[in-house]
Amino acid sequence: MVEKIIHFSDLHIKLYKDHKQYKDILCRCFKEWSDLEPDRIVFTGDLVHSKNQMTPELINMVTWVLSQCSKICPTIILIGNHDFLENNLDRVDALSPIINTMGNPDIMYFKNSGVEEDENINWIVYSLMDHNKRPDFTPDPAKINIGLFHGPIQGLVTDMGFAFEDGYNTNEFRGCDLVLAGDIHKHQVLGIPNNKKAYMVGSLIQQNFGENVRKHGYGVYNIKNDEYKFIEVDNRSPYLNFKIKDITDIENGKEKLTNF
């Protein structure tokens, strides 16, 4: 029976840059996750950054991440918009060849929309391969119906203050007991029908200067208590934005950090 879920998203692994920094952070996460003894790890999209551009370094990094997760517990991967070419579905996505070659039964790649049965859970998969069309499903009252989603949702905002007024309609999540989501890199919680919640976990690691240093990490969902806890991850090499009037602010130590 699945009782505890680790939720993370939006790694955006680059072709060859920043892999050492990512490994340092991920190794600490893997240790924490192993200690938490989860039953499932769920990644909600954008494992890679450059869509279908690949390098040997990227393949090695993706394989390592998936292998380490699967050693902790069975791991579920959702496709993100950076993992394939949305405007050309005839092209193979970046993750399928890697996951297929690995042949690891503890890595479950939910690429297409639908309902995936998994012990006491029905995973309700909203897939970008089908333009996030609502899956045809009837909620099973005997199971926990968990939506998996990657994309902007109405009511979300970015660290820069942009609001997604035309994002995905939360009514499309009706029937879900909760939704685990990725895509927007700022951690947020949204209400969905029937007084349930959608958790946009945010990116595990700060991606650029347009994002705040803090509030990047992963979520832990306890099914028994219906409790979702966000855990912030320490980044020892952050992108820092400073505001100064002139060079004397730096000389006098009066520069102001604006994206903490």
Where are these regions (language model features)?
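Core catalytic region of metal-dependent phosphoesterases/phosphodiesterases
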Residues: V2, L11, L15-V115, E172, ...
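Active-site glycine-centered loops adjacent to acidic/histidine catalytic or metal-binding residues
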Residues: D10, G45-D46, G80-N81, H150, ...
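Hydrophobic anchor at the start of a short beta-strand
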Residues: T75, N145, Y228
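Conserved catalytic scaffold of divalent metal-dependent phosphoesterases
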Residues: D83-N171, V201
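Conserved beta-sheet core of the metallophosphoesterase superfamily
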Residues: D159-N225
